[in-house]
Amino acid sequence: MRKTGLMLIAILCLFLLSRLPAGSCTVFRLKAGDGALIVGRSMEFSVDLKYDVIVVPKNKAYASPAPGGKEGLAWKTRYGYAGMASFGMDYGLSDGMNEKGLAIGVLWFETDTKWQDVAPDDSKQALAQTMLGDWILGNCASVDDVKREIQNLKVFKHADPTLNFSPPVHIIVYDATNGCIVIEYEDGMCKIYDNPLGLMTNAPRFPWQMTNLRQYVGLTSETPGPYEIAGLTFPATGHGAGMFGLPGDFTPPSRFVRLAALTRFADKQPDAERTLNLAQHILNTFDIPSGLVKDTSPDKKTVTKETTQWATFRDLTHRILYFKTYDNQNLRKIDLNRFDFSGTSVKRIRMFGISEIVTDITDQAH
């Protein structure tokens, strides 16, 4: 039964590959007044990918395949980490953070991604693209580490063994010193972009997204004063007129612009706790309820509905991962400082189906 279910999901995912958009993930960073860094991220998809949180210890052995059935890169994790993995797997992270405060976000990338070729003599450097996020968290403590160490890899196109296709993705990486980069693969080359804004959505490529922001330099949080034309006075119709023209749809370019405006103008908060609250408010504006974004197969029989399956908030400074899910908007907390990352087994934390969605405070009346 489980095998049949996974096969059906694979068929749906293959269908999604041929149509746009397939995922509307959104990620951003906020800095508190005391320097604490909070990263917020939403995960949208049209298929239930059966996510759990996995906790991976130090010295956990991993091995990548290589093209042609050869053995690829093998490594043991230097750092323990926690992140979101699908279908019961202990790799293939979409999101996560390690004990050094390094965090990744793996986002769908609707463009002409071309991974690296692997020469016969380079098999031991070959890393399946589905394992890149795991490799980063397990081996790197900073953005500079990633920039340096990734040059030794050959990241190749590899079909996910569960879904039977190779997801087109790009990756954003944050560290606890406010570093941030975007990694995209184009024409078989690894392109790394410094990302001082700390924002990313999906397609087009990151440099295009940054250039597109120039179209919106007139956005402001200030309500404009009245205009006088031909002796007539025209005041703004209401507060918020300074944001007129801010795109409100769910396409990746529009979400990128909206992120830039919200993170630019929202009041900076003094500490991690209140910045976490601000991050929730910002990410709420990108939430996709079921039915709002649909895709239909050519035979009009299959409709996929993209939803915000889960959202994460990572405190890079204090090494705390928070998350909420579509079925339960209550925030849950995972403190990486409390884990003993020794041992070799991967632990799991269930994300969905957790009760106590509503807190009854009736009896607190006095």
Where do the PLM segments sit?
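Positively charged n-region of N-terminal signal peptides that target proteins for export
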Residues: 1-4
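Bacterial N-terminal signal peptides
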Residues: 9-18
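Short, surface-exposed beta-strand-loop junctions and turns on beta-sheet-rich folds
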Residues: 45-47, 110-112, 188-190, 328-331
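Aromatic- and glycine-enriched pocket-lining scaffold segments that form the walls
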Residues: 143, 147-185
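Structural recognition of the beta-strand scaffold that forms the well-ordered cores
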Residues: 38-40, 103-106, 172-174, 182, ...
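A contiguous strand-loop segment
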Residues: 23-124, 153, 157, 360
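C-terminus-biased signal that marks the final domain/tail of proteins
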Residues: 23-37, 46, 149, 158-159, ...
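Proteins synthesized as precursors that undergo proteolytic processing into mature forms
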Residues: 122-159, 272, 276-281
